[in-house]
Amino acid sequence: MRYRQATYYAALAQRALWRTLPAGQPLQPSDIKQLYSDELRAALAADFALSFSLTQIAEYTQSDGTAPLIITDRERWAAARAHALVYDIVQPGCDITHSQAGIDALCTLTHDPQTSLSSTIHLCDARLGGALAQASGRALGQLEQTIYCLIDSAVAQDDTPWHLAKLLSPATDGTIIPIIQLRPKTLLATLSTYELLALFIGYGYEPRIVDCTTADPRQSDADYTAALAWATERTAALRQPAQLRPHKARRPLLLVRTPEQFETLLDDDEAQEDSLDDNGDVQPSSIARAQAALAHRKADGADSSWARTQAWLTQVLAWCEPENLFDAAGNLTFAETKALPHTAAAHADNDHANSHTAQLTAQTPALVATPLRRPAIEPYAVVATPPGTQRSNTLSRVGSYLADLAKDAAPDSFRLFISPSLQSGTLAQCFASQPRAWQWGSQPSIAPHASDGYTMSYPAAGALRGMQLGYLEQGRQSVFVGASVHEDMSAASRSYTAALASQPSSTSLPSLNTILSHQSAEQVTNALDQRDAPTTVYFPADSNCAVVTPDMMLSSTQVINVLHASDTTQPTWLTTKAARAQMHAGLATWNFASHTSPDIVLAACGDIATTEVLAAIELITHSCPAARVRCVNISSLTPRGFGTLAQPVSRRTLARTVTTTKPVIIAYPGEERSLAATLFAYGVDGRQFDIHSFGLAPCGDTLMTSLINQQASRYDLAIAAATCLSATGVISSDDAQRLMEHCRAAIEQCLAHAREHHTDHPMVTTWQWQRGQ
């Protein structure tokens, strides 16, 4: 119990001193800087419940000699870190005394909790499916892995993808034991025993309730240990041969009613605010009671809430007994020690110790990215000579490449994660015949399913993302495929960046690879807005560039790769050799459509933009032969600039490519502000650049209609170029007016045809590059 109280105290210190570093003294109520206590109370209640379970798992796993992996929500960083920290402190060779160094060590803060606190405790993002999603990814193909998912009841009732267990095979995948902390004043805690069992049986589990609210703590410990042993036995029974397993294998799940010592403090404080009913009965402890108490406290105002916070924290501190954490000699001591076993502490012996301050080091087993045999690119290429004469769907060859890669890869070295947003289009058709992993009877969708399927799909894209993160953190490679208008990269980027920070410098984490179809301007900006994330967004100009890109993505490590293309049929411009050079360079001049001494530069980013820019160049040179135009292609961007993280574009290269004096018109499939920020970072004159941004939303418009409405079509680009060329005196005002009138007439033709036939005009769909032929 003393060990638990030490971790409670450390967690309390971290929570309460979030913005105030410890000054070398034990935590005092006066250190609290928060006016409202409700959020702090809820966090500490969850932290203390987690600390209780960590202690129980530690004792159980020590008895059988196993090395578990414990995954919990990142919001529980204070409890997880406190538990690991206190364990480090009690190790041999770590002499923590009742001094400033000792108290500072016990109250160590983490303002940026990473994903791994040790080789045992792992933190995850609740927005990506939480502990269960990442545990499911880690367990894929890892039969010997045992993972305990500690899930707070507030998270379990809303954000946990419970059906993910139906994707895992008991015979080939690792053991996952979900443990739900049933805290009072949460929705699940209001359910009766029958309702709880019925709920999780319906989810596909075999639940068992562990009641640890008894007065005798030894009985709680014994019940918890027995439940963990039962869960281990039930999992072992599911690993018998398939013909002996039940058709629907229900995995064990524990529902723990946690001790209420801490909750009693809450109830005692709230009892002063709650009134008795008319008949003298006390209002039941429920969600309604918690909401009523919260409303009452807020009505009292900030001053009284602050005062109650101080009084309440005084009770909590007294219960934690911080003054008894040290013995008469000033050393941290416990009457009963239940330490969480992990390899984070690497302390020297007492005779050789050179430091008296405990340090929590995140030491995880060295990861080695699984080698992956990738198919040759050439069989998937489209003939591209002369440029622009052949048309192909930009992502069709990518789908074929990935499907063959998944089929021929070594067992469990590669997985495809297909988002539910990918419902239509050529890319979706490429994966339609790929069997999805499924272990639970009837198929949940029209796509084929199989118990040995290696393609993962789940209705919640966030949970699928979390599963991918767990999978790659085991050193294995993967690709997430979805439609960009429905995906949000921010949570995945933050979680992956945190995972990178947790890895030792000697390890290489496989890249987080994503392919997004149906270009969304918001998602391009979203990916590039993550300034601290190691992100590269690829914009292939055609199908050959697109099929080269996955090969580059899968050969990289420690990077967030995003391939962003339109899933539409576009001309093919580059051979595979030229495509590879373009994608590696990130920014290049296309000589076949350029003049060496240009009067104006037209730049394209992505497949649709490339077609529109080249069509605009043809319009300009046909109407105004005297105009000298340069065509530039932008094939990759990072939050830091043009190019890739491995090969960024320098200021000198940018100036040489787009010139420093000539006007530049850019067609860009993202929000204008993101590209403007990139150009600003290069220190260029913003007046030189005219950005025509666009996005493709599923609004029912044809492609050309959508581009015209956003002033990003070939005709809008040609009009903008004519305006610039006329202003600089390259062409006469009559030539400029003639070109603009021609373009406006073409726009009217396209819009009229789309209104009548609901398709784009043939002069758009059958257009071919003619210059130089």
Regions found by a protein language model. Name each.
Residues 51-59, 65-68, 83, 119-120, ...:
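Short alpha-helical segments and helix-capping/turn motifs at coil-helix boundaries
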Residues 74-77, 151-158, 181-186, 213-215, ...:
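Acidic, glycine-rich active-site loops and adjacent beta-strand->loop/helix elements
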Residues 2-29, 33, 40-45, 49, ...:
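Non-catalytic terminal/interface segments that mediate subunit docking, oligomerization
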Residues 29-35, 41-171, 428-430, 466-474, ...:
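Cofactor-binding active-site loop characterized by glycine-rich and histidine/acidic residues
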Residues 111-116, 130, 142-144, 161-320, ...:
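Thiamine diphosphate
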Residues 510-519, 528-531:
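Conserved catalytic alpha/beta cores of large enzymes that bind or transform nucleotide phosphates
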Residues 66-70, 146-148, 175-177, 206-207, ...:
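Beta-sheet entry/capping signal
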Residues 85-93, 142, 161-172, 268-273, ...:
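A glycine- and small-aliphatic-rich helix-loop capping segment at beta-alpha/alpha-beta transitions
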